[in-house]
Amino acid sequence: MSSAHFNRGPAYGLSAEVKNKLAQKYDHQREQELREWIEGVTGRRIGSNFMDGLKDGIILCEFINKLQPGSVKKVNESTQNWHQLENIGNFIKAITKYGVKPHDIFEANDLFENTNHTQVQSTLLALASMAKTKGNKVNVGVKYAEKQERKFEPEKLREGRNIIGLQMGTNKFASQQGMTAYGTRRHLYDPKLGTDQPLDQATISLQMGTNKGASQAGMTAPGTKRQIFEPGLGMEHCDTLNVSLQMGSNKGASQRGMTVYGLPRQVYDPKYCLTPEYPELGEPTHNHHAHNYYNSA
């Protein structure tokens, strides 16, 4: 089986755009540093094309065996595609056990099908950093920070609960200490006076306003009768004969004597109209001189 079976065709559209962006992130200077490191450890020449020299997985397996002996038990030197893929898979498993994080490791197709050489380079750099952390002399990558584990006694852990963290703010400066619910009466007093308890109920706090100036003292509900009198007269309460201002006036025109609208009303003048006399028993009922009413209906 030829290797052409595993090669992909040219990419178009979005796939080509993604492939170009990944290719732009490839660092050729890092490639030269990795080449010198791998060739120095394994003693084998990679070739002019760096990725093609690693494609069969033979150099990679020998390289991890140098860093960690016994990592790959068998290295396939066959030219068959599945043997080369098997070498790459064994290398990936070996560097995972060596300590490289899974998110830093490339996939087999990234190298074998030339789909993402940038990820392959990132994996080799992560392997160099892990080797430097374990004490190998490597000029590539960075050394990982060592874990600084601390063990605390249970008493120390319980004491930490009394500490206010920075995320909870501070207990200095202005605070809401002593604040009550909205609308609740609050007593204001001077602590310099030495009074531990608030003042009595006769004290008006600042939140309740002031007892000076205009106020609503003596005000009643709207529409309620209010007695108006002069305090100089010595009368605490006015009698019922006084008409308050809220009740109007008893002078001028009024509706006194008015009847319901539409009822007949008898109008007569007592100077000209005699007092009506009602007949006694036995007298005739018709007496035109005794009744002088005019119906104004």
UniProtKB/Swiss-Prot annotation:
Keywords: Actin-binding, Calmodulin-binding, Phosphoprotein, Repeat. It comes from the Eukaryota. The keyword Lyase does not apply. The modification Phosphoserine is found at residue 175. InterPro entries: Calponin-like, Calponin/LIMCH1, Calponin_repeat, CH_dom, CH_dom_sf, SM22_calponin. GO terms for biological process: actin filament organization; actomyosin structure organization. It holds the Pfam family CH. Thin filament-associated protein that is implicated in the regulation and modulation of smooth muscle contraction. It is capable of binding to actin, calmodulin and tropomyosin. The interaction of calponin with actin inhibits the actomyosin Mg-ATPase activity. This is Calponin-1. It comes from Mustela putorius furo.
